């Protein structure tokens, strides 16, 4: 038992306490999570909600505030007993038992965070007795491990364990009801209110060396507009808090709201990208609305979103430089001749061509 406990540890105790994030804003269920951890009672909790809204961060920052050790385990469809409880490993030419993160957390009375648990399969059923707080029998080394005081479990998921019918969360599975029933409570995590999300973005901006309250306000209003449309079934995609933070990061690098928005939207299909960009353009007149170039007068000017390394590429294909706007531009007619090439530069209509 002593050998397995020693060789099971691969990190110092201090490194198991999450770092406190300067950009973190406490909101929603944070106080509930912190209260449960502080109580020292075993009370497994299931936290569910759409992606990128801070479920995992909330648990880890609660541990950081309380200076509690946290073992975060990222669950996949391949996660099994060997990954969770431990197994025999070849170390320095010798085969020894090494505890897995679940057993390590139990021995140390730490918080166990099962991240994206709904990606797991029946191979995780080895956790049933652990979820009951009764400890675990390690049959391969004939040892029973009882949980130390303070041990508890949190699981995060995008679904409630019933899979994803719309395909948004591909890979999630229908979880075993007996496992789900072993969680004491379920917390439903929504996206942060606009006022809270703005605070999150402002803290992110400050961490990157700038502050733009106007931009932060427009971004949160934009995300709220899209989420309302999503809830009403008008659109199939959504803007997460994580994606808003990525917009802020892009702005810090490129110093352009337009570029920051476009970079964040590139992961979506063309129709969604155009719709989301148009949503933002309604809130910020510094951003031009993307339109269907085939419906425009052929002489309409289309400004391009390019970086310095692309200037020769667009120039050689007929683009001209506008000193006032500091942008390259072509006509709608030019775009229509090779839309696949020009659309990568997000051409936006502004005015009738001066040439």
Where do the PLM segments sit?
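C-terminal regulatory/interaction module of P-loop NTP-utilizing enzymes
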Residues: 1-296, 350, 355
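Accessory DNA-engaging acidic/polar modules
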Residues: 291-355
């Amino acid at each position: 038992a002593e050998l397995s406990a020693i060789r099971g540890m691969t990190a110092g105790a201090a490194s198991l306490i999450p770092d406190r994030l300067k950009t973190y804003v406490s909101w929603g269920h944070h106080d509930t999570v912190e209260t449960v951890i502080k109580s020292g009672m075993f009370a497994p909790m299931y936290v569910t909600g759409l992606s990128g809204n801070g479920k995992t961060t909330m648990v880890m920052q609660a541990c950081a505030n309380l200076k509690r050790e946290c073992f975060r385990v990222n669950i996949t469809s391949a996660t099994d007993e060997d990954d969770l409880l431990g197994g025999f490993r070849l170390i320095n030419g010798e085969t020894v038992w090494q505890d897995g993160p679940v057993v390590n957390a139990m021995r140390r009375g730490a918080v166990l965070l099962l991240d994206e648990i709904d990606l797991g399969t029946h191979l995780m059923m080895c956790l049933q007795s652990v979820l009951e707080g009764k400890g675990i029998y390690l049959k391969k080394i004939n040892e029973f491990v009882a949980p130390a005081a303070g041990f508890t479990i949190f699981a995060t998921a995008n679904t409630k364990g019933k899979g994803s019918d719309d395909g948004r969360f591909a890979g999630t599975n229908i979880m075993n009801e007996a496992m789900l029933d072993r969680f004491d409570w379920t917390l439903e995590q929504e996206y942060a209110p606009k006022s809270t999300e703005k605070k999150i973005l402002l803290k992110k901006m400050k961490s990157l060396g700038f502050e733009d309250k106007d931009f932060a306000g427009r971004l949160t209003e934009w995300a709220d507009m899209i989420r309302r449309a999503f809830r009403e079934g008008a659109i199939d995609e959504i803007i997460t808090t994580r994606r808003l933070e990525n917009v802020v990061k892009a702005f810090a690098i490129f110093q352009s709201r337009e570029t920051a928005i476009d970079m964040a939207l590139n992961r979506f299909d063309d129709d969604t990208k155009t719709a989301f960009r148009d949503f933002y353009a309604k809130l910020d007149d510094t951003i031009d609305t993307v339109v269907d170039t085939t419906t425009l007068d052929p002489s309409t000017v289309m400004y391009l979103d390019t970086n310095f390394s692309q200037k020769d590429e667009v120039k050689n294909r007929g683009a001209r430089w506008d000193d006032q706007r500091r942008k390259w531009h072509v006509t709608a007619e030019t775009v229509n001749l090779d839309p696949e090439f020009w659309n990568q530069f997000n051409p936006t209509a502004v005015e009738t061509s001066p040439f």
